[in-house]
Curated annotation (Swiss-Prot):
This is Recombination protein RecR. The lineage of its organism: Bacteria, Pseudomonadati, Pseudomonadota, Gammaproteobacteria, Aeromonadales. Keywords: DNA damage, DNA recombination, DNA repair, Metal-binding, Zinc, Zinc-finger. A zinc finger (C4-type) spans 57-72. GO terms for biological process: DNA recombination; DNA repair.
């Protein structure tokens, strides 16, 4: 069915969001126009402001509207000596949500993917290399995704860390808590067996 050209444009624009197809976009557009016009206007203003004002932390490259994000600006985070390398700001949020990490981060904004033209320069690895040499980092924790590209990126960075004399580790991968072994795929189970931990 054809709608007004502006409504069609609105629905197409909503489809840039992950998981939003034509039907979801139509439902969102109709909801905003029928019942949530004030909420829609507020959303439009905040989107405009966020897309204009939010940039990257000059130290770790996560999202912030300031020169330094709150984590990098916190001197207690530096005291731990831990630096965790992740692929995206969403990974920072996930790790922070656990409450188990008190160090700092470096956000790659992706992973090595030569076929897509993503090399060390695009990931800011020269900045990371400078940090490894200049800062007092006791351990570099590699928390890239457990994919072929994520593993390749982790190995590349591990070589950099070793060359700088920094201890390096990789987050564990394996069977999820509450998972049943018969339902776990072979690759995950292999990682679990290779990364097993002693019970003390």
């Amino acid at each position: 069915m054809k709608f007004s050209p502006l409504l069609d444009e609105m629905m197409k624009a909503l489809q840039v969001l992950p998981g939003v197809g034509p039907k979801s976009a139509q439902r969102m557009a109709f909801t905003l126009l029928e019942r949530e016009r004030s909420g829609g206007l507020r959303l439009a203003q905040l989107l405009n402001r966020a897309l204009t004002e939010i940039g990257h932390c000059s130290h770790c490259r996560t999202f912030t509207e300031n020169a330094l994000c709150e984590i990098c600006a916190n001197p207690k985070r530096e005291e731990s000596g831990l630096l965790c390398v992740v692929e995206s700001p969403a990974d920072v949020a996930a790790i922070e949500h656990t409450g188990q990490f008190s160090g700092r981060y470096f956000v790659l904004m992706g992973h090595l993917s030569p076929l897509d033209g993503i090399g060390p320069e695009e990931l800011g690895l020269e900045i990371l290399e400078q940090r490894l040499k200049a800062e007092s980092i006791s351990e570099l924790i590699l928390a890239t995704n457990p994919t072929i590209e994520g593993d390749a990126t982790a190995w590349y960075i591990a070589d950099m860390a070793r060359a700088a004399g920094v201890k390096v580790s990789r987050i564990a991968h394996g069977v999820p808590v509450g998972g049943e072994l018969e339902l776990v795929d072979g690759t995950t189970l292999s990682h679990s067996l290779m990364g097993r931990q002693p019970l003390n």
